[in-house]
Amino acid sequence: MSAYNALNDVPCTLNAWLLTKVLREDWGFKGYVVSDCGGPSLLVNAHKYVKTKEAAATLSIKAGLDLECGDDVFDGPLFSAYRQYMGTKAEIDSAAYRVLRARMQLGLFDSGEKNPYTKISPAVIGSAKHQEVALNAAR
């Protein structure tokens, strides 16, 4: 997840150095990056970093943001930006690919009997061992 704040005067939602150079290239992250809820809209309304939601959508995608929490910018404004040649199909496809790949790996497109995660009972998920792991991760 990106963040609401800025790093080195660049909002994290569209910070290519952070999302692509550090996260993907240096650290080898292969997953997808989702914004904080409403984060791309804040590029216009709060950060005043860009003037339009189309610019927010385009620059976020180019920087390595794959999914918006909410649908204020990656819905109509992204499509509008694409029609105005502000972004490329390849950039949008890369973001969509990363999101869909993760969902496929989680079995979200499989039927219930093929998805191993549907067989994990709440008793296992909430077990003392798992609670201990979660507590240690939070520390």
Model-predicted regions and their roles:
Residues M1-R139:
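Glycoside hydrolase catalytic-domain context in secreted enzymes
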